[in-house]
Amino acid sequence: LARAVRTRRFWWLAVGYIAGLYAWYAVQVHQTKYLVEIGFSATDAAWALGAVSLVAVPGQIGLGYLSDRIGREWVWAIGCLGFVICCLALIALERTPTPFLLYVMVTAQGALGYGLTSVMGAITAEIFQGRHYGSIFGTLMLLMIGGGAAGPWLTGAIHDATGSYAIGFWIAGGLSLVSAVAIWLAAPRKVRA
């Protein structure tokens, strides 16, 4: 663990995972309240949250399979793109609250964004394989949880201060891009190759 923590790759993974989970939970925790605030019924908002999990299952399986063919970085980038699209759809829904945009948000978040989980362990294993993998991945998970906690908290604080979720969703979308770049910089493909 001590050797891993002294590498750039470890810290790029940490940045990628923290930023990715920030976006994930910023959206997941606030989307239902947000959808109700902008005019969707409580039933539709709850349906959207449940549907995200439903479409996540084939997305995770498909993206996990795809990662074995095209590489982990590509699949991580696809997952991050899912959260970018999700955040943009959420922002657009405030002005155009249509079922189509709701379906785009649900599909992008679930089928693409939730695919991040299909490669988290594999990315870390490709860079830090061996007997210390568990302690390295566990440490990264502790850092990741920080991003998962900060996302909902900061998004809620921004909403409370401004009365809008827009800035919070822009931040989440931006951090999704940061996450994708960080995983490319960690470069598991160079270890795998």
PLM ranges: what are they?
Residues V5-L63, G151, T155:
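Extracytoplasmic gate region of multi-pass secondary transporters
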Residues I18, F100-G115:
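Hydrophobic core of transmembrane alpha-helices in multi-pass small-molecule transporters
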Residues A42-T43, G130-T139:
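Loop-to-transmembrane helix entry/capping segments in MFS-fold secondary transporters
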Residues Q60-G71, H159:
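Helix-to-loop junctions at the C-terminal end of transmembrane segments
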Residues R69-C80:
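Cytoplasmic membrane-interface "Motif A"-like loop-to-helix N-cap segments
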Residues G82-R95:
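C-terminal ends and interior cores of transmembrane alpha-helices
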Residues G115-F128:
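Intracellular juxtamembrane helix-capping segments at the cytosolic ends
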Residues A157-G174:
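A membrane-interface helix-boundary motif in multi-pass transporters
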